[in-house]
């Protein structure tokens, strides 16, 4: 029986490899001089404008990328995802985060069952609960309104909701709805994170949302037990039922923990953690802070891109184009990283979230059939809002390693500022940099230009910019809840396109398991050493040395301590 073919074995891949050498000889200065080419590399959907003309690609490159998509059966794979097929083959699961934002009357099936009614049952439950908390009909154990929320989760249970929360904080409608309320996220098992989260909060007015599908995630459950103790020590054990709710499917463990199972909000195996922000994982805490109506607009924005992704032809399909260009940059041009550069402080948590979505999804070394990949896949994602990043790592991007960049601009600021007598307003100053940076990267500055400017000879090498550094520009009209949902879905589907073309499973994450299992061994050793005084055994010399040093330096830690909570 023949082995399954890798995408790199197809004629389309080989054709792009042959095409590569010619493209590498053409500088972006020359490519950008072709107006017809540039016009062909601009796409608009629902007033979202994508300009990918500053990619190291010709129209012929793009045509060949479409052929690569066909060779990878991209359209069929997208359809299979929407049809609920078990495309997460290693875990035998559907991948249906699109169902989380589907309209109530939609039909999206997993294993022959329409899951949309289940989704809306949970959404209706969230709306009812969040409305009651916000209007004061659900109160705490001492009769006070619950104005503060701590969401406890890690990974996808944290990064996505934090991104959306941060983006909504300065939106006029959302910020008005959030007045007098506080939403915090507790993720790290580091006790410092606990201290910072409870600092300044009153247990009487605090609601804790514990997010864990199985209710067994080690870090999350330790943090949840810590906050349970914080509440119980102040208000008594019975207060837990009024001050803690869960996002989980393990109702027996939820009840055992002390949370009423009626106050547990479900999500499903077909929702991956990093794709779960549109489930109760994100919708519950965000609705408590901003009201369900705002969050529903966010879901509608994501759904609009879901429809666009599934129906638009490749040449007009924003996630498909972005995904194919990433494959081109990574696997052919050899650029291992990508900078996500939103020119909006509201999007300061976009890059950390997409870092997880992308790197946990596509950080794989084998195909979906288990074959080692003979080409580079996956990207190292990082980023910072402009203009902060310009004063941080742009030096390397301009004159060091070539790193393709995503520039994201917003036409109308959430919070405009105008000062009389200034040459431009604050947002125009920001956007001046948004428009300038892609050209600086593409065109650079030659030694000849510097000579014409009478730059000293010895400084010319230091002031030369090679240019020819690719980027894309995305221009959004506003940054309200709807547009935030669209931006999220664009990046989610872009990641899926890359994985579909590379032929990998973008929806499992076995790479996180080994470290967790080794941590279990260390945890047992720490307990044995502290409680029984046992020496460190069963580890390599390096780990044994480090562990022994740590235990000796913390020998004053009691083996069976009394409860001690942060005091800050």
Curated annotation (Swiss-Prot):
Presence of keyword Repeat: no
Catalytic reactions of this protein: alpha-D-glucose 6-phosphate = beta-D-fructose 6-phosphate
Coiled coil: none
Domain of life: Eukaryota
One Gene Ontology term, aspect cellular component: cytosol
Main subcellular location: cytoplasm
Active site residues per record: 360, 391, 516
Location of the protein in the cell: Cytoplasm
InterPro entries: G6P_Isomerase, G6P_Isomerase_C, Phosphoglucose_isomerase_CS, SIS_dom_sf, SIS_PGI_1, SIS_PGI_2
Sorted UniProt keywords: Cytoplasm, Gluconeogenesis, Glycolysis, Isomerase
Annotated pathway: Carbohydrate degradation; glycolysis; D-glyceraldehyde 3-phosphate and glycerone phosphate from D-glucose: step 2/4
Listed GO biological process terms: gluconeogenesis; glucose 6-phosphate metabolic process; glycolytic process
Family: Belongs to the GPI family.
Quaternary structure and interacting proteins, as annotated: Homodimer.
Protein name as annotated: Glucose-6-phosphate isomerase, cytosolic 1
Biological classification of the source: Eukaryota, Viridiplantae, Streptophyta, Embryophyta, Tracheophyta
């Amino acid at each position: 029986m023949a082995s399954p073919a890798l995408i790199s074995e197809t004629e389309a891949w080989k054709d792009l490899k042959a095409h590569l050498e010619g493209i590498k000889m053409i500088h972006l200065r020359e490519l950008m001089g072709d107006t017809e080419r540039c016009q062909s590399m601009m796409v608009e959907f629902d007033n979202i404008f994508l300009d990918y003309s500053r990619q190291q690609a010709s129209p012929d490159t793009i045509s060949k990328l479409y052929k690569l998509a066909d060779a990878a059966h991209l359209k069929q794979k997208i359809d299979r995802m929407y049809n609920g097929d078990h495309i997460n083959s290693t875990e035998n699961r559907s991948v249906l985060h699109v169902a989380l934002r589907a309209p109530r009357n939609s039909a999206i099936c997993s294993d022959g069952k329409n899951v949309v009614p289940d989704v809306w049952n949970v959404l209706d439950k969230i709306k009812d609960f969040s409305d009651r908390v916000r209007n004061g009909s659900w109160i705490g154990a001492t009769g006070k309104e619950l104005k503060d929320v701590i969401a406890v989760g890690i990974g996808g249970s944290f990064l996505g909701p934090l991104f959306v929360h941060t983006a909504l904080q300065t939106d006029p409608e959302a910020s008005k709805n959030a007045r007098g309320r506080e939403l915090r996220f507790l993720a790290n098992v580091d006790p410092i994170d606990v201290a910072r989260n409870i600092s300044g909060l009153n247990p009487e007015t605090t609601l804790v949302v514990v997010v864990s599908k199985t209710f067994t995630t080690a870090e999350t459950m330790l943090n949840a037990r810590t906050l349970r103790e914080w509440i119980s020590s102040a208000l008594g054990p019975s207060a837990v039922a009024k001050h803690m709710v869960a996002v989980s499917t393990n109702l027996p463990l939820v009840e055992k923990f002390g949370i009423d199972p009626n106050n547990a909000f479900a999500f499903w195996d077909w929702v991956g953690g990093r794709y779960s922000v549109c489930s109760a994982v994100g919708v519950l805490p965000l609705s408590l802070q901003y009201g369900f109506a705002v969050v529903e607009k966010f879901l509608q924005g994501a759904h609009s891109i879901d429809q666009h992704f599934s129906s638009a032809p490749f040449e007009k399909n924003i996630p498909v184009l972005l995904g194919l260009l990433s494959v081109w940059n990574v696997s052919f041009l050899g650029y291992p990283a990508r900078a996500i550069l939103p020119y909006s402080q509201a999007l300061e948590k976009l890059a950390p979230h997409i870092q997880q979505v992308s790197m946990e999804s596509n950080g794989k070394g084998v195909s979906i059939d288990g074959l080692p990949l003979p080409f580079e896949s996956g990207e190292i994602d990082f980023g910072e809002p402009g203009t902060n990043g310009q004063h941080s790592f742009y030096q390397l991007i301009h004159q060091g390693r070539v790193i393709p960049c995503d520039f994201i601009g917003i036409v109308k600021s959430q919070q405009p500022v105008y000062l009389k007598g200034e040459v431009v307003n604050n947002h125009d100053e920001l956007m001046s940099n948004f428009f300038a940076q892609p050209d600086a990267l593409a065109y650079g500055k030659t030694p000849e230009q510097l000579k014409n400017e009478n730059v000293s000879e010895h400084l010319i090498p230091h002031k030369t910019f090679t240019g020819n550094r690719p980027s894309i520009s995305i221009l959004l009209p506003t940054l309200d809840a709807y547009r935030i949902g669209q931006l999220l879905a664009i990046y989610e589907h872009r990641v899926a396109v890359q994985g579909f073309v590379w032929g990998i499973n973008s929806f499992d994450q076995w790479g996180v398991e080994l470290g967790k299992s080794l941590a279990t061994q260390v945890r047992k050793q720490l307990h044995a050493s502290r409680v029984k005084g046992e020496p460190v055994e069963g580890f390599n010399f390096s780990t044994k040395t480090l562990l022994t040093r740590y235990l000796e330096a913390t020998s004053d830690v009691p083996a069976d301590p009394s409860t001690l909570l942060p005091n800050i």
